């Protein structure tokens, strides 16, 4: 039974001038909400320390209260209490508070007592007197810390609605803090989450995100976090209430634990929702998130922030914004962090961003770290590192140079050797090697380095089963580049590269012919690769290999000339060009020139003299002249007239300028963009690492802007066309720099 001293203690706790008596449970510390401890928010508690107050202080306060009310109060005793405070309205209010508190403290499983206490507290929260409302809010907050009374509160929709309404409408800081704290305590339970949701608590909590009081902010964000994690419909409600904009605005705060919860809320809201990603972008989210990655060292914050960036990195609108904000460099700072989950998230995000970062400056540190990560024992790390390197070396002269200088060739070759038949690793690694072996100052060194580090056997092996078409396509392009180095001609031949290239060419050509005969008009995709691309790539690789006399003998011995002549009739200009190019090389040998003529090549070659692509026309002219070596002078003269009228049909002086011969194939290739939100690496079955949507032109790694032949393309003035050898001398030497397949992210 309660004594007079017990009642005095309760009365003192509620006096306005005695607020200090409960200040020890008003600490403004930060909330865990499951982020910092790793705990979930399932009932009965989200974490080991779910309240902002210290547990020992809580226990002390509740202990003191329980000491005073350890026995149940009878109705007579409650009536005595009422009698003592019946003189004024304020005294009656205090009496009502005591009555409600007594009932709630005694509440265990007695639904009748709860039913009697809750309406009284609810009425007080709705009182017009703000002093009364404040006292009620303080009391409800204190009671919400005790499990029994907390359940009584959450099971009353009227009470929860009153708490939400009071929090939203009050101008009193203490009232706002207590009501927000009460909702936070309720959010530890699924029943409480549902009650908050049904009472319209989410718009009210979003409104509180604009509070200037830190403790209110902490309660609001952690309660919203619990709702987002466990309450169905909460995500949409937060979006509709403008929560995304409010949360992005809070990213300029400096408390790392608060930021960790806020960024996790953003990740939950943005995942799988394009509209949310665009709202984050419009609110300045990318820059703020990158700033966090650049500024802080708290692992949990870096991890949650990297998760948001990972989700945003698959959005085509957010991707360039993150890159421009310095996202690549900021993420690269954490690739050597001891936290593997942070490293993996940064790598996934970098991989997603890398196709939009091919022109970024200041990537030296990142590239060096990525080359080191190729030696990791973690397959996911190696896979991502290879993919990022492939994209960053596409169309970027400086990045190619840097990767070569830090041992990238050796590291990539070793990666391919270690990967075996794991195409999610070998394909991006081969793509990166293809980029590094062409169109930069150290390209020849790179071509040699692949051989010196024992890479040729494994590269040729990848042309064979079980390799799938995306990997084969990348490998063919690499072999073409390796053939630019004369020292690789014999080793490639000895490894059996030529017969396999011919086999692939024949198979791909047959597939295209079969489709055409069946009335198909669109190009055929097999595992995300067009068979026309394989035809073009294999023919182009054979073209470069045919510079070697011994390779020409092997190529001719495989009965390829009829097929090359047939390819001259292809409706695809790129294929016409590589077919004319390989015939041009083969025609250096008299026997081959005769075989080419015997296959009826004169007619299609003569037709190609009128091609709008000057590269095609030039190769066709060269083949015709080589075929005419043993023809009568009269025939040569007529051919010279035909060539003159064809090749000089427009502006003859352009042949004396270092202009575009038309040997370029068109649009530049794009680096591969990752669009899946699943962090797992894209498999070749869904389109392959090398899938793109740019057509055959995208197989090249052109420089941005207008193309110019460059030092590998001396374009001399076309001499007297009556002399065959002079025409040959006027050709670009082997078309070494402008063939498709040699440098792109496939």
Question: Where is each model-derived feature located?
Answer:
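Extended, compositionally biased low-complexity polar/Lys-Gly-rich tracts
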Residues: 5-7, 50, 529-552, 558
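Hydrophobic alpha-helix feature that most strongly marks membrane-spanning transmembrane helices
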Residues: 569-572, 588-591, 610-613, 632
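Alpha-helical scaffold repeats of the Armadillo/HEAT/TPR superfamily
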Residues: 116-117, 154-163, 197-204, 239-246, ...
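Intrinsically disordered, low-complexity regulatory regions
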Residues: 1-123, 128, 137, 510-530, ...
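Alpha-solenoid helical repeat architecture
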Residues: 125-128, 167-171, 209-212, 227, ...
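Alpha-helical solenoid repeat architecture
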Residues: 44, 93-105, 120-124, 135-149, ...
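Short, hydrophobic/charged alpha-helical patches characteristic of ARM/HEAT alpha-solenoid repeats
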Residues: 105-116, 120, 131-132, 149-157, ...
């Amino acid at each position: 039974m309660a004594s007079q001293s017990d009642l005095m203690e309760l009365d003192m706790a509620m006096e306005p001038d005695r607020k200090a008596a409960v200040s020890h449970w008003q600490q403004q510390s930060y909330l865990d909400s499951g982020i910092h401890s790793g705990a979930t928010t399932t009932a009965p508690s989200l974490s080991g320390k779910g309240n902002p107050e210290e547990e020992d202080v809580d226990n002390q306060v509740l202990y003191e209260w329980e000491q005073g009310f350890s026995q149940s109060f009878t109705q007579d005793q409650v009536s005595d209490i009422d009698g003592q405070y019946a003189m004024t309205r304020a005294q009656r209010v205090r009496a009502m508070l005591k009555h409600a508190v007594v009932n709630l403290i005694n509440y265990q499983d007695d639904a009748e007592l709860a039913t009697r206490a809750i309406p009284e507290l609810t009425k007080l929260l709705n009182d017009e007197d703000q002093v009364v409302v404040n006292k009620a809010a303080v009391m409800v907050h204190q009671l919400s810390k005790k499990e029994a009374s907390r359940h009584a509160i959450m099971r009353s929709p009227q009470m929860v609605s009153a708490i939400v309404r009071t929090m939203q409408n009050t101008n009193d800081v203490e009232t706002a803090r207590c009501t927000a704290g009460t909702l936070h305590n309720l959010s530890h339970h699924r029943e409480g989450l549902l009650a908050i949701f049904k009472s319209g608590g989410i718009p009210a909590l979003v409104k509180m995100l604009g509070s200037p009081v830190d403790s209110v902010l902490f309660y609001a964000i952690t309660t919203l976090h619990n709702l987002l994690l466990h309450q169905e419909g909460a995500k949409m409600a937060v979006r509709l209430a403008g929560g995304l904009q409010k949360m992005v605005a809070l990213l300029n705060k400096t408390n790392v634990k608060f930021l960790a919860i806020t960024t996790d809320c953003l990740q939950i809201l943005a995942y799988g929702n394009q509209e949310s990603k665009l709202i984050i972008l419009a609110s300045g989210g990318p820059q703020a998130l990158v700033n966090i990655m650049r500024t802080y060292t708290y692992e949990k914050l870096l991890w949650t922030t990297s998760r948001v960036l990972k989700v945003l990195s698959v959005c085509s609108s957010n991707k360039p914004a993150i890159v421009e904000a310095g996202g690549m460099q900021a993420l690269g700072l954490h690739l050597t962090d001891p936290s593997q989950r942070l490293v993996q998230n940064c790598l996934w995000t970098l991989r997603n961003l890398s196709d939009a970062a091919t022109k970024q400056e200041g990537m030296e540190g990142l590239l060096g770290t990525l080359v080191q990560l190729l030696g990791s024992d973690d397959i996911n790390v190696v896979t991502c590192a290879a993919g990022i390197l492939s994209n960053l070396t596409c169309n970027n002269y400086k990045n190619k140079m840097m990767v070569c200088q830090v041992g990238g060739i050796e590291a990539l070759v070793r990666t391919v050797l270690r990967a075996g038949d794991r195409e999610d690793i070998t394909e991006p690694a081969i793509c990166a090697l293809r980029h590094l072996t062409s169109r930069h100052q150290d390209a020849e060194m790179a071509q040699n380095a692949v051989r010196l580090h024992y890479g040729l056997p494994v590269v040729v092996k990848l042309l064979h089963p079980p390799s799938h078409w995306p990997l084969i396509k990348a490998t063919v392009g690499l072999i073409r580049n390796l053939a630019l180095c004369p020292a690789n001609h014999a080793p490639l031949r000895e490894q059996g590269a030529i017969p396999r290239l011919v086999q692939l060419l024949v198979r791909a050509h047959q597939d295209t012919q079969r489709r055409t005969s069946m009335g198909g008009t669109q190009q055929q995709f097999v595992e995300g690769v067009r068979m026309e691309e394989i035809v073009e790539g294999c023919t182009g690789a054979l073209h470069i290999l045919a510079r070697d006399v011994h390779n020409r003998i092997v190529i001719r011995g495989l009965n390829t000339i009829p097929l090359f002549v047939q390819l001259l009739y292809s409706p695809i200009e790129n294929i016409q060009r590589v077919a004319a190019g390989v015939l041009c090389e083969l025609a250096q040998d008299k026997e081959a020139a005769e075989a080419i003529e015997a296959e009826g090549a004169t007619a299609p070659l003569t037709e190609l003299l009128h091609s709008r692509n000057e590269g095609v026309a030039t190769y066709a002219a060269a083949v015709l002249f080589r075929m005419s070596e043993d023809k009568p002078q009269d025939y040569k003269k007529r051919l010279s007239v035909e060539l003159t009228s064809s090749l000089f049909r427009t502006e003859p002086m352009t042949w004396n300028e270092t202009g575009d011969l038309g040997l370029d194939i068109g649009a530049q290739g794009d680096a591969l963009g990752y669009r899946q939100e699943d962090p797992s690496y894209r498999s070749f079955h869904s389109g392959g690492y090398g899938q793109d949507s740019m057509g055959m032109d995208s197989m090249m790694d052109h420089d941005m802007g207008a193309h110019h032949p460059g030092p590998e393309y001396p374009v001399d003035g076309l001499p007297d066309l009556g002399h065959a050898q002079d025409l040959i001398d006027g050709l670009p030497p082997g078309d070494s720099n402008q063939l498709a397949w040699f440098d792109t992210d496939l």
